[in-house]
């Protein structure tokens, strides 16, 4: 049986009854092409001068890695000329990136985290690129795009995905018809379909969380993790393994393939901030993929894809993965809320 490339897959999606729009198909291909370029930069590493920090900080107040800036520029340059986008937004930029007047303007909005897990770059662990696509409001063709046009709940995404730069370079994609995996064939220069309609396996006893923050967690999160750590002698009557890479792409990829739960919850160090991860660049696209694969994505109390964003760089707590495990964490939050109300 011949291999199916990303282009062939997207054309097939375009021919179906609920057809993938041609402009969205072309946009996804351009994003995938940019990810190939970023993969090449990651692979060159120190030989290409890609490693190390810059003196600048991004809008999040984080010191930028060289590769953060390079990947951001690659995505901007690849996507601004195609005529498919009305504007772009990046985790690395304070404001939105308007399409230059010399290029035609399209009907979609692209958001991305150019390099997720960039703290892993210098130690040669997996990093990735996360992206999300929204439809621009109909009236943007006659006016300038604003940040408000991006502030749509995650359920309105029309496509989302990530590239993971590890032993293989993989592209994980959903256009609303399931989750598909493509591997970069470097000899062909093509993305080749390697796994289709991915479903999160149920019952895997693994959790991904940064245990060093345990003392700062809210009681429902602490309760869940304490029960996991108690193993066969605790209420779960099963042993659990912890996995943590400090790269959301790597941890979520493992959960899509093996099951389990990923958590980056609110903690008491910054009580006025809802969480660490960015809603628009990380939680929404990953939540979209997790739900398309049969899982659940909550902030602890609410479905992530239903959150109405108030700001472009809004942060949120994240609990996503196996449906049964996420339901348990959500129930613990509800129990804690009820206890507060009746106290």
From Swiss-Prot:
InterPro entries: FBPase_C_dom, FBPase_class-1, FBPase_N, FBPtase. It is found in: Cytoplasm. It catalyses: beta-D-fructose 1,6-bisphosphate + H2O = beta-D-fructose 6-phosphate + phosphate. GO terms for cellular component: cytosol. Mg(2+) 1 binds at residues 91, 113, 115. Pathway: Carbohydrate biosynthesis; gluconeogenesis. Pfam families: FBPase, FBPase_C. Keywords: Carbohydrate metabolism, Cytoplasm, Hydrolase, Magnesium, Metal-binding. GO terms for biological process: fructose 1,6-bisphosphate metabolic process; fructose 6-phosphate metabolic process; fructose metabolic process; gluconeogenesis; sucrose biosynthetic process. It is an enzyme of class 3 (hydrolase). Binds 2 magnesium ions per subunit. Its main location: cytoplasm. One of its GO terms (molecular function) is fructose 1,6-bisphosphate 1-phosphatase activity. Substrate binds at residues 116-119, 210, 276. Belongs to the FBPase class 1 family. Homotetramer. HAMAP family: FBPase_class1 (MF_01855). This is Fructose-1,6-bisphosphatase class 1. The lineage of its organism: Bacteria, Pseudomonadati, Pseudomonadota, Alphaproteobacteria, Hyphomicrobiales.
């Amino acid at each position: 049986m011949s291999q199916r490339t990303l282009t062939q897959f997207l054309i097939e999606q375009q021919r179906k009854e609920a057809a993938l729009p041609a402009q969205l198909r072309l946009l996804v291909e351009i994003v995938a092409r940019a990810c190939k370029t970023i993969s090449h930069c990651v692979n060159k590493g120190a030989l290409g001068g890609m490693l190390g920090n810059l003196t600048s900080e991004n809008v999040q107040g984080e010191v930028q890695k060289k590769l953060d800036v390079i990947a951001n520029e690659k995505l901007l340059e690849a996507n601004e000329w195609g005529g498919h986008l009305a504007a772009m937004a990046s985790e690395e930029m304070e404001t939105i990136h308007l399409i230059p007047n010399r290029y035609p303007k399209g009907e979609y909005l692209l958001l991305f985290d150019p390099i997720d897990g960039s703290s892993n770059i210098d130690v040669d662990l997996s990093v990735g690129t996360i992206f999300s696509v929204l439809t621009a409001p109909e009236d943007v063709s006659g006016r300038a795009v604003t940040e408000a046009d991006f502030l749509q709940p995650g359920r309105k995404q029309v496509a989302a995905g990530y590239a993971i730069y590890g032993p293989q370079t993989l592209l994980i994609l959903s256009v609303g018809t399931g989750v598909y995996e493509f591997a970069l064939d470097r000899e062909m220069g093509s993305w080749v379909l390697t796994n289709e309609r991915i479903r999160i396996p149920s019952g895997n006893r693994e959790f991904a969380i940064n245990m060093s923050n345990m003392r700062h967690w809210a009681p429902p999160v602490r309760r869940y993790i304490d029960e996991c750590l108690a193993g066969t002698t605790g209420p779960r009557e099963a042993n659990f393994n912890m996995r943590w890479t400090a790269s959301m792409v790597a941890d979520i990829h493992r959960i899509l393939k093996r099951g389990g739960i990923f958590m980056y919850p609110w903690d008491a160090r910054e009580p006025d901030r809802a969480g660490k991860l960015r809603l628009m660049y990380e939680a929404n696209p990953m939540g979209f993929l997790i739900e398309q694969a049969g899982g659940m994505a909550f902030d602890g109390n609410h479905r992530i894809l239903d959150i109405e964003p108030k700001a472009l760089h809004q942060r949120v707590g994240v609990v996503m993965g196996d449906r049964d495990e996420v339901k348990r964490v959500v129930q613990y939050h509800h129990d804690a809320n009820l206890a507060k109300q009746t106290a």
